[in-house]
Amino acid sequence: KIPIGALSLTFDNTKNYTLKKETDKIFQLVEQMLYYARSENTEKDYFVKQLQLDEVIHNVILKFRHSLMERKVIINIHDIENVVYTDEKWLTFILSQIVQNAIKYFDKQENKLTIYSQDNETNILLVIEDNGCGIKTSDLSRVFEKGFTGSNRNKANATGMGLYLSKKLCDRLGLKLDIASTEKEYTRLTIIFPKGTVHNFSE
């Protein structure tokens, strides 16, 4: 038996991109299931520390580099030098779900992914915006529901778990996750990191 991660690395060094894509899909589904199981006991599996946003974002983009290149995505990353305090692996997973969602729903000849952060008096905001198919206004209030894929999203083989898990984990980490979208134009997700507080996981 060969671990899925090892298979993925093997295909990185070959031209068998079709097999690699299918392996990546399996890996992502398994990852979602594992994090779903672990999300019930986040307090037993977290380590809050100072994180440089640029390093975390770089690693997530690197993780999806093949898919981003395949879709010929124009990536605009700027102003991400801010520091936040949270758990690195959970934040990496949340960002991975958001970027993965963006890749699934790109539908333009010129696909764009924009990532930046903002610093205000009380929070650090991390914004991830794509110019994909967007979300219908009637669906927007339900995107964080478990299993909800929306009427625009069936074609992408969506599981309805990515944004649900992202929201759930943000809540557990004391972060806020906001979404804004216009159908056929864009989707923007904003992770809000409160300054100067450490979340109590017993809440």
Model regions: which residues?
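Short beta-strand/loop element within the Bergerat-fold HATPase_c
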Residues: 112-122
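Short conserved segment of the HATPase_c
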Residues: 135-147
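Short alpha-helical segment of the dimerization/phosphotransfer core of two-component systems
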Residues: 21-26
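Conserved micro-motifs of the catalytic ATP-binding
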Residues: 41-46, 79, 83-86
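Short helix-loop "hinge" at the ATP-lid/N-box region of the Bergerat-fold HATPase_c
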Residues: 102-103
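Acidic ATP/Mg2+-coordinating residue in the GHKL
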Residues: 130
